[in-house]
């Protein structure tokens, strides 16, 4: 995936927990059980009744899907989830040990954080009492002139996501420096479309959202009439903000989200909001300029502040304070929040066990503290050394691929090769760990732990202003099951969490590892040359390095992918957005080709029969493609599929597998397909 590093206040769902110098009460909802081992190539997952040339995903994953229904505490279950659950269990082992018998001050810190989170008994006893100081701040607001200072306190001190995001990012046209930035935000539903589309499903969701808001206000003590009026205010304000929000697809274009302007321009866009008062209530120094990422949004926000009554604005702030805290308050709040956001929107049948939620929360707050011990126990040095060799092999293959492109001129190829040569690789974990010594954690006070963590994070980010960019910083924690390309750093990043089976396994043959982690590596590299990454140069600056003819040829080829994936239908009546998913689809296709090229190079060096030697009855090429498809094995709820089709830049696993192989003739050769079959179309889409 591609990540643009933008760090505002760390948003947490807050609550209070208490465990005076004792172990937190056991989680009554579940007892942690070590997940079963995971393997990279699973013959039993294959459904041999399916013709791989007709539906390769169903062939490679058919039996896995039949034998792995979605657990009741999930809305999606796939190979990523399998590894994620295993990594989370191993992280829990460290947290539980630190909560009961810490050996170092750092272990005590993250152990206390986890222990505080696990005290659900006290959360039930306290109800919404932990949130009363925040609600009192909102209630004290006596005029609109005080709104900006209050918003700053809610964002920075409490981590409450209201109106917009403020934080720090790399300057996209001068990547060596950090700048302040503001962007659209402030919506409770997943996307602007949920407010603006009038089809029956969206109308129903808005009705359910209002019902949720009414119930939330009533839990906080409002009567029926007041709760309904407040919910109406929330919907009206969020709908107005949604109308002023830039669509996701447009935000993929750096030019649409980069507006480096004087700080005073914010007052021109939104004069009803005192930006000077806002800034004075953050850790930020006086700003001369900043990136106003979505200018039209701030015009809409200004109209909201001007047109809505003070009481309506306070209802909006109050709702978001309650909503962000609800998952960690007493059981009625937790259940209500789960019922709408997970059950209604995502189709998840049951609440996730508290130990899982607290483990993930601790990783978010203190990820590089917990990660130090996790890496020592779960990521041996030889794993990093093996990854370094794989990355080098993939970089060599991508360079060869660029050189062989028939549609690109030598002039642009030279620039592309220079960008590839400038890639930086980060594998496993940071070279230098973050210092959490200034973050105070109390074993008996979760809500303030979360507030302090939010303030700690924004202070950490604001402190970067005016300083050189730290190119060694990570945007994911070590146990994360993911990987990313950061265009402003021109680097590829692979946390230790993903460097495990089914993606990477020491004992497996090269075909399996190249089909797993090899494709992931190639995927992240290709992001440097997709519809977004191709607009950044070797130094990470937005800068056109293409000839006009080559750019036109590139866009013609990517338009093929837009149309191809835009016709995939993950759920009845709803197709994928080919423009939203273009970057990930391009990276999937390019990553597959590059990894295959690298594998063939390795096999060629191993001897004459290496490319034909069968294991489990499959040639290396077949094992490569099956390994690739099996990392995408998954089952999804209908609700999850609908939300992700509208908001997720990644295609569902079925289309990530089939879409990539049907565009690659080498797949057809490996399985004896012929032109015209579904997995070997007459006119495949080929970019890289």
Regions found by a protein language model. Give the residues of each.
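N-terminal secretory signal peptides that target proteins for export/translocation
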Residues: 1-3
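Bacterial N-terminal signal peptides
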Residues: 7-17
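Boundary at the C-terminal end of the N-terminal hydrophobic targeting segment
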Residues: 17-26, 30
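Short, Gly/Pro- and small/polar-rich lid/capping loops
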Residues: 28-44
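Intrinsically disordered, low-complexity linker/terminal regions across diverse proteins
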Residues: 30-34, 84, 234, 269-272, ...
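Active-site-surrounding "flap" and adjacent substrate/cofactor-binding loops of secreted or lumenal enzymes
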Residues: 32-37, 50-55, 59-125
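Hydrophobic/aromatic-rich, well-ordered segments within soluble, folded domains that form packed cores
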Residues: 46-66, 195-218, 582, 589-594
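Noncatalytic, helix-rich "gating/capping" subdomain that lines the substrate-entry/channel surface
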Residues: 96-393
């Amino acid at each position: 995936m591609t990540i643009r590093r933008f760090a505002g206040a760390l948003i947490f769902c807050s609550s209070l927990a208490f465990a005076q110098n004792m172990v937190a009460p056991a989680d009554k909802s579940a007892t942690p059980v070590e997940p079963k081992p995971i393997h990279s190539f699973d013959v039993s997952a294959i459904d041999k009744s399916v013709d791989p040339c007709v539906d390769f995903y169903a062939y490679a994953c058919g039996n896995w899907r039949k034998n792995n229904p979605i657990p009741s505490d999930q809305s999606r279950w796939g190979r990523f989830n399998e590894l994620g659950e295993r990594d989370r269990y191993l992280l829990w082992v460290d947290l539980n040990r630190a909560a009961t018998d810490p050996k170092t001050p750092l272990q005590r810190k993250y152990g206390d954080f986890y222990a505080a989170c696990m005290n659900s008994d006290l959360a039930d006893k306290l109800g919404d009492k932990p949130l009363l100081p925040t609600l009192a701040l909102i209630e004290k607001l006596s005029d609109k002139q005080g709104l900006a200072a209050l918003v700053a306190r809610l964002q920075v001190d409490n981590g409450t996501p209201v109106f917009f995001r403020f934080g720090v990012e790399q300057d996209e046209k001068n990547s060596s420096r950090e700048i302040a930035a503001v962007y659209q935000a402030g919506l409770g539903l997943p996307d602007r479309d949920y407010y603006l589309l009038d089809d029956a499903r969206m109308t129903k969701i808005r009705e359910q959202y209002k019902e949720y808001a009414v119930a939330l206000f009533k839990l906080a003590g409002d009567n029926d009439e007041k709760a309904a009026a407040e919910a109406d205010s929330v919907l009206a304000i969020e709908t107005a903000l949604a109308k002023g929000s830039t669509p996701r697809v447009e935000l993929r274009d750096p030019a649409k989200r980069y507006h480096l302007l004087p700080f005073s321009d914010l007052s021109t866009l939104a004069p009803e909001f005192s930006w000077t008062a806002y800034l004075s209530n953050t850790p930020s120094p006086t700003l001369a300029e900043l990136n106003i990422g979505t200018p039209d949004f701030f015009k809409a926000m200004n109209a909201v502040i001007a047109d809505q009554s003070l009481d309506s604005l306070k209802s909006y702030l109050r709702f978001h304070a309650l909503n962000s805290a609800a998952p960690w308050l007493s059981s009625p709040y937790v259940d209500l929040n789960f019922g709408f956001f997970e059950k209604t929107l995502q189709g998840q049948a049951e609440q996730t066990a508290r130990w899982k939620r607290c483990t993930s929360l601790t990783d978010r707050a203190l990820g590089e503290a917990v990660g130090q011990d996790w890496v020592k126990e779960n990521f041996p040095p030889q794993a990093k050394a093996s990854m370094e060799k794989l990355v080098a092999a993939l970089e060599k293959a991508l360079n060869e691929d660029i050189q062989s492109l028939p549609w690109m001129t030598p002039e642009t190829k030279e620039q592309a090769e220079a960008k590839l040569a400038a890639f930086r690789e980060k594998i496993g974990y940071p070279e230098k760990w973050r210092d959490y010594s200034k973050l105070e954690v109390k074993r008996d006070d979760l809500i303030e732990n979360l507030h302090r963590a939010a303030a700690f994070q924004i202070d950490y980010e604001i402190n970067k202003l005016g300083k050189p960019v730290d190119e060694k910083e990570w945007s994911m924690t070590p146990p994360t099951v993911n990987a990313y390309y950061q265009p402003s750093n021109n680097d590829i990043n692979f946390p230790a969490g993903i460097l495990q089976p089914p993606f990477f396994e020491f004992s497996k043959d090269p075909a399996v590892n190249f089909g797993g982690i090899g494709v992931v590596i190639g995927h992240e590299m290709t992001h440097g040359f997709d519809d977004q990454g191709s607009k950044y140069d070797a130094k990470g600056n937005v800068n056109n390095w293409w000839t006009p003819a080559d750019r036109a040829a590139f866009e013609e080829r990517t338009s093929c992918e837009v149309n191809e994936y835009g016709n995939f239908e993950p759920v009845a009546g709803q197709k994928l957005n080919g423009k939203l998913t273009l970057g990930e689809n391009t990276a999937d296709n390019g990553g597959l080709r590059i990894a295959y090229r690298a594998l063939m190079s390795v096999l060629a060096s191993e001897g004459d029969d290496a490319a034909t030697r069968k294991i489990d009855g499959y040639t290396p090429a077949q094992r490569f493609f099956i390994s690739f498809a099996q990392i995408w094995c998954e089952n999804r709820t209908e609700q999850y599929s609908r939300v992700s089709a509208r908001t997720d830049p990644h295609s569902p696993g079925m289309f990530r597998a089939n879409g990539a192989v049907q565009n690659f003739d080498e797949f057809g050769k490996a399985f004896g397909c012929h032109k015209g079959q579904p997995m070997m179309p007459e006119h495949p889409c080929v970019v890289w």
